[in-house]
């Protein structure tokens, strides 16, 4: 078990290094004093800076032969919470923001280094392709 955790941590470190300066991705925060098992590697898509939403990103990843998942949906908008407690998504903007944008990318101990590189390359390719191109505001 410890060796699997070490591998996942190592791969998570690669993701953090590769994606840390990519505009359009928000990475999970880590605390140095906490020994995280890195069971999953979720990223948040900053859709204000992209021309695609999470579902379109997931479809683009699928076309690159890379699976993704939604492991942390917001519970605020579910039938139970809306009916039982009268919760409305607009009253929980942070949960709604994350719930609509979070996606898990592959992270498992049997991944090869080539698999890891393929995930990194695919994420960068898709994010770079769909990043909003900011205009200068000048009229041509």
Where are these regions (language model features)?
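PLP-dependent aminotransferase class I/II
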Residues: 1-140
């Amino acid at each position: 078990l410890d060796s699997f955790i070490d591998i996942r941590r190592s791969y998570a470190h690669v993701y953090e290094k590769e994606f840390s300066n990519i505009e359009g991705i928000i990475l999970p925060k880590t605390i140095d004093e906490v020994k995280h098992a890195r069971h999953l590697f979720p990223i948040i898509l900053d859709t204000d800076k992209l021309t695609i939403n999470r579902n379109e990103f997931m479809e683009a990843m699928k076309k690159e032969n890379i699976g993704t998942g939604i492991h942390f949906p917001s519970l605020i908008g579910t039938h139970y919470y809306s009916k039982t407690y009268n919760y409305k998504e607009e009253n929980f903007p942070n949960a709604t923001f994350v719930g609509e944008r979070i996606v898990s990318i592959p992270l498992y101990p049997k991944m090869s280094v080539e698999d890891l590189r393929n995930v990194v390359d695919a994420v960068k390719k898709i994010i770079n392709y769909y990043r909003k191109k900011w205009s200068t505001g000048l009229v041509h």
